[in-house]
Design a protein with these regions (language model features):
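Flexible active-site lid/hinge loop adjacent to a nucleotide/diphosphate
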Residues: 22
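Class I S-adenosyl-L-methionine
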Residues: 1-16, 26-123, 128
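Short, glycine-/small-residue-rich phosphate/pyrophosphate-handling segment
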Residues: 134-137
Length: 137
């Protein structure tokens, strides 16, 4: 592996919003358009994957109760592996990556491996539901 992978790769821990494809942020769409790898969760609306580059590697890493496609540890290692290959990676998570999304664990793993990353916030369903219902928080 090339020791200067940090110069070529970056990971975007990206919130996909609460499910409505119209609620993803423009910055998240921009990240999807440039990523060579997209690792997405179960709660991500699959329609959002249309924003990925045609040649992007799309990997499912969904988890449901007692039914994981990958454990969190394996997801962390996968993100690190793809970044060390010199690829721009979007870790696409339902809602916001740091609100019930285990984004902090992934960020710690990236920091431990000295891999540059950026957090792209997403609209959480905890906020969106109240707004849709007209209930102020």
């Amino acid at each position: 592996m090339n020791g200067d992978f940090q110069l070529k790769s970056k990971v975007y821990l990206t919130g996909a919003g609460p499910g409505d494809p119209g609620l993803i942020t423009l910055k998240a769409i921009d990240c999807l358009k440039k990523a060579r790898v997209v690792i997405y969760d179960r709660l991500v609306n699959p329609e959002l994957l249309k924003y990925a580059r045609p040649d992007a590697e799309i990997l499912y890493a969904g988890k449901a109760s007692k039914k994981h496609s990958l454990t969190q540890d394996k997801i962390n290692r996968l993100i690190v592996k793809k970044a060390k290959e010199g690829k721009t990676v979007v870790r696409l998570k339902g809602g916001d990556p740091f609100l019930f999304g285990r984004g902090a664990e992934e960020a710690l793993e990236l920091a431990k491996n000295k891999i540059p990353f950026e957090v792209i916030p997403g609209i959480s369903s905890a906020l969106a539901v109240a707004a849709y219902a007209g209930i102020p928080l």
